[in-house]
From Swiss-Prot:
It comes from Bos taurus (Bovine). The modification Phosphothreonine is found at T3, T152. The gene is PGAM2. This is Phosphoglycerate mutase 2. The modification Phosphotyrosine is found at Y132, Y133. The record marks H186 as: Transition state stabilizer. It catalyses: (2R)-2-phosphoglycerate = (2R)-3-phosphoglycerate; (2R)-3-phospho-glyceroyl phosphate = (2R)-2,3-bisphosphoglycerate + H(+).
């Protein structure tokens, strides 16, 4: 029997998604398409008459702005919002800023898929000479992190390892207390939550593609186990095309 509902949404397309670049912790803006996706997400949530009590997002503007757009479009901008680096996208290390298709052509599609989708193999680390090192590693928003917490690269396993404690300590207790939760985050941090909820294998989570800007709804029991498969708020064709587009990102052109 379902007792709780959780809604999650991956941010709308960013300017770097549009350019097919590894984004990670770089603070890219929403593209025009991404802003429209966020508005459609807001409309889908409004049409479903969903209300929330508390919201969670990352410290990256593409997720924050997606959340703002949803809250604005559903007239819930007054809701409390918790921002945390633990819901950030996976840190793509030395690949940050590179075009995915060009990287696939140079290193091979299999290598890019390993870097993007393997569970425990991280990409090359971001060193101090990297053009985006200062704008990420020396950013004021991360000044409060403890020694060893700020990554230079992450595998999916690493991403889940820093996202799940926040889920367990902060989000899950709110849901169990009856709060209606909305999470606006990123493909890989959300993948970690999905893996945890569904008990998915490492291999299965590698193949899961979450579309941008389409709300994901879970019905959960008292133990926060899904009572039904995840469902998307949107028509089937839109959802299918979006998931195919995500899967095609690491292929050479």
């Amino acid at each position: 029997m379902s007792t709780h509902r959780l809604v999650m949404v991956r941010h709308g397309e960013s300017t770097w998604n549009q350019e097919n670049r590894f984004c990670g912790w770089f603070d890219a803006e929403l593209s025009e398409k991404g802003a429209e996706e966020a508005k459609k997400a807001a409309q889908a949530i409004k049409d479903a008459k969903m209300e929330f009590d508390i919201c969670y997002t990352s410290v990256l503007k593409r997720a924050i702005r997606t959340l703002w757009t949803i809250l604005d479009g559903t007239d819930q901008m007054w809701l409390p919002v918790v921002r945390t680096w633990r819901l950030n996208e996976r840190h793509y290390g030395g690949l940050t800023g590179l075009n995915k298709a060009e990287t696939a052509a140079k290193h091979g599609e299999e290598q890019v898929k390993i870097w993007r989708r393997s569970f425990d193999i991280p990409p090359p680390p971001m060193d101090e000479k990297h053009p985006y090192y200062k704008s990420i590693s020396k950013e004021r928003r991360y000044a409060g992190l403890k020694a060893g917490e700020l990554p230079t690269c992450e595998s999916l396993k690493d991403t889940i390892a820093r996202a799940l404690p926040f889920w367990n300590d902060e989000i899950a207790p709110q849901i169990k207390a009856g709060k209606r939760v909305l999470i606006a985050a990123h493909g890989n941090s959300l993948r970690g939550i999905v893996k945890h909820l569904e008990g998915m294998s490492d291999q299965a989570i590698m193949e899961l593609n979450l579309p941008t800007g389409i709300p994901i709804v879970y019905e959960l029991d008292q133990a926060l186990k899904p009572t039904k498969p995840m469902r998307f708020l949107g028509d089937e064709e839109t959802v299918r095309k979006a998931m195919e587009a995500v899967a095609a990102q690491g292929k050479a052109k």
